[in-house]
């Protein structure tokens, strides 16, 4: 089996990649700026006996995301799982959101997953898509993250729509974790 994970070099994306590799999955790992972390993760994946290919792209440019998924499908033509984990999270209260922040949030958090999934389903006969959401979008708790919340709400609605539209060939799910990043001064256990 094979999986492709955006934002797979660090944190939750890395944990998903390592978990799947332990189970024998081959991994396509996306990163943007974290080459050292991506190479380290690749080495760890290969220690489990799984294949790992690295893919670099700025998901803030949706066409670059589509070009990347084309390369992923060359390496993994029968891709079983695509995980849209990469996201940007900018402080942006409604009164201060500018076009640049708004576009970046939607390009990375919504448009790139949209068009990558579209390319995936048009080039594979079956598979699984997992969109990483955020628990904050259910209750509107994070009012200082207007553009982020809107982009994740759009991704949540896309998840629901595609789960219906693409079944039974493709299973589409969303996972909405709570806070997962450790404090820069904290330990892994904290």
Language-model segments: residues:
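Conserved glycine-rich cofactor-binding loop
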Residues: 9-10
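Conserved glycine-rich Rossmann-like NAD(P)H-binding loop of the short-chain dehydrogenase/reductase
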Residues: 25-39
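The beta1-alpha1 cofactor-binding region of Rossmann-like NAD(H)/NADP(H)-dependent oxidoreductases
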Residues: 35, 56-67, 99
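Conserved NAD(P)H cofactor-binding loop of Rossmann-fold oxidoreductase domains
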Residues: 85-90
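Substrate-binding pocket helix/loop in short-chain dehydrogenase/reductase
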Residues: 93-94, 101-106
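Catalytic loop of short-chain dehydrogenase/reductase
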Residues: 130-167, 179-181
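A glycine/serine/threonine-rich, flexible loop-to-helix segment
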Residues: 176-190
């Amino acid at each position: 089996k094979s999986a492709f994970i955006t934002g797979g070099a660090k944190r939750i994306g890395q944990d998903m990649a390592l978990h799947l590799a332990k189970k024998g999955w081959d991994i396509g790992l996306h990163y943007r700026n974290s080459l050292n972390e991506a190479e380290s993760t690749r080495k760890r994946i290969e220690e489990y006996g799984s294949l790992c290919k690295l893919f670099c792209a700025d998901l803030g440019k949706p066409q670059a995301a589509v070009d990347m998924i084309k390369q992923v499908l060359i390496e993994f033509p029968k891709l079983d799982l695509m995980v849209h984990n990469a996201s940007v999270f900018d402080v942006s209260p409604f009164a201060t959101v500018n076009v640049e922040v708004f576009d970046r949030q939607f390009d990375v958090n919504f448009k790139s997953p949209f068009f990558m999934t579209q390319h995936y389903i048009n080039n594979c006969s079956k598979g699984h898509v997992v969109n990483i959401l955020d628990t904050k979008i259910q209750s509107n708790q994070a009012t200082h993250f207007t553009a982020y919340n809107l982009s994740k709400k759009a991704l949540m609605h896309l998840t629901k729509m595609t789960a219906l539209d693409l079944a039974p060939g493709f299973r589409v799910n969303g996972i909405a974790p709570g806070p997962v990043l450790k404090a820069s001064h904290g330990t892994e256990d904290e």
